């Protein structure tokens, strides 16, 4: 076991330090904010279309009359603002960040909404990235959200663990594609959700076929 940092929110060890403690330390929202259901969109593999599926889910629920938000947890590879055609920057008060609102009323928060240029790289270590994800949840003025979709980065690393342990995730949607290699890696994300008792509420096989023109 590595040296303990006493930050149980980013640790998967079941050691004596956390005996009697819940492994899930849910971070509270800002006072006056409300978020109903929270769903993570995950895949062990990159390039399968998680961000596009996240965007389409958000648009669909918004069209059904719900207040919707998207939290872009892919800190080093954010693409949610681009998917919605957003190129501006998020505003802030003295003590909070304001989500960017799309033309159809969907609330967005992504690291690309905080950078001076959307092509600037994010070169941060894992603990800093995890802290940013928590800030996106607890320091943003989310306004009466019925459904929040969290666009997760590929893999089963620090960010996924951080989200599952500090956000009240109601379930995950798994995104895959038909390739055998992708299937093998996606199973890692499935098993992670099962190990952490996060319900799998949907499976999307993206890029499964192409319809040729006549």
Predicted regions and their residues:
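Residue-level signature of catalytic and energy-coupling elements of molecular machines
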Residues: 35, 46, 72, 80, ...
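Conserved catalytic-core segment of NTP-binding enzymes
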Residues: 146-147, 153-214
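Short glycine/serine/threonine-rich phosphate/pyrophosphate-binding segments
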Residues: 50-56, 77-81, 152-160, 182-185
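Amphipathic alpha-helical transducer elements in NTP-driven molecular machines
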Residues: 32, 77, 126-134, 157, ...
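Phosphate-binding/switch loop-helix module in NTP-utilizing enzymes
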Residues: 115-166
């Amino acid at each position: 076991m590595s040296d303990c940092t006493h930050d149980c929110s980013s640790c998967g060890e079941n050691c004596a330090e956390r005996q009697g403690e819940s492994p899930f330390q849910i971070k509270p929202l800002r006072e006056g904010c409300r978020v109903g259901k929270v769903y993570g969109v995950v895949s062990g593999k990159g390039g399968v279309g998680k961000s596009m599926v996240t965007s389409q889910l958000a648009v669909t629920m918004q069209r059904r009359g719900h207040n919707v938000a998207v939290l872009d947890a892919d800190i080093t590879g954010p693409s949610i603002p681009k998917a919605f055609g957003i190129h501006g920057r998020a505003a802030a008060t003295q003590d909070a960040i304001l989500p960017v609102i799309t033309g159809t009323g969907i609330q967005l928060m992504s690291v690309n909404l905080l950078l001076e240029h959307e092509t600037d790289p994010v070169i941060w270590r894992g603990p800093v990235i995890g802290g940013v994800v928590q800030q996106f949840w607890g320091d943003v003025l989310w306004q009466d959200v019925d459904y929040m979709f969290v666009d997760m980065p590929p893999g089963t690393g620090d960010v996924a663990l951080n989200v599952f342990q500090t956000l009240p995730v109601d379930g995950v949607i798994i995104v895959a594609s038909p390739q055998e290699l992708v299937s093998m890696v996606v199973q890692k994300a499935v098993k992670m959700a099962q190990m952490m008792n996060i319900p799998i509420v949907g499976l999307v096989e993206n890029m499964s076929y192409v319809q040729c023109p006549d």
